[in-house]
From Swiss-Prot:
One of several proteins that assist in the late maturation steps of the functional core of the 30S ribosomal subunit. Associates with free 30S ribosomal subunits (but not with 30S subunits that are part of 70S ribosomes or polysomes). Required for efficient processing of 16S rRNA. May interact with the 5'-terminal helix region of 16S rRNA. It is found in: Cytoplasm. It comes from the Bacteria. GO terms for molecular function: ribosomal small subunit binding. Gene3D superfamilies: 3.30.300.20. Keywords: Cytoplasm, Ribosome biogenesis. It comes from Leuconostoc mesenteroides subsp. mesenteroides (strain ATCC 8293 / DSM 20343 / BCRC 11652 / CCM 1803 / JCM 6124 / NCDO 523 / NBRC 100496 / NCIMB 8023 / NCTC 12954 / NRRL B-1118 / 37Y). Monomer. Binds 30S ribosomal subunits, but not 50S ribosomal subunits or 70S ribosomes. One of its GO terms (cellular component) is cytosol. This is Ribosome-binding factor A. The gene is rbfA. GO terms for biological process: maturation of SSU-rRNA. NCBIfam families: rbfA. Belongs to the RbfA family. Its main location: cytoplasm.
């Protein structure tokens, strides 16, 4: 089990670097509208779960984005390996963060309640 402060620092570095790589290095149009919301590392720092959000609510766009991220994960991991100061670069696992859509849904419900009253 890694030191929690070290894991947190490394997660922040991974988030910053992945965001930078998606903006500047990855030319796949499927991943242009991706926002990295957070990164969680496993206890042994071997797996980085990268949570992302997209602006579109369409299921087809979500699938395309997931496929684009998985296709780019090898290049992203290689670039992370040269940027991070760790013995082994963590494996990357991309997961869509649906909290933004959930928050928008809750806001819509509250707005409807206010307009009804």
């Amino acid at each position: 089990m890694a030191n929690p402060q070290r894991a947190g620092r490394l997660a922040q570095e991974v988030q910053r670097d992945v965001t930078d790589l998606l903006l500047k290095r990855i030319n796949d149009p499927r991943v242009k509208e991706v926002t990295v919301t957070s990164v969680e590392l496993s206890g042994d720092l071997q797996i980085a779960t990268i949570y992302y959000s997209i602006l579109s609510d369409l299921a087809s766009d979500a699938k395309k984005t997931q496929a684009g991220l998985e296709a780019a994960s090898g290049l992203i991991r290689k670039e992370l390996g040269s940027r991070l100061t760790v013995y082994k670069t963590p494996e990357l696992k991309f997961v869509r963060d649906t909290s933004v859509q959930y928050g928008n849904h809750i806001e819509d419900l509250i707005r409807k309640l206010h307009t009804e009253n």
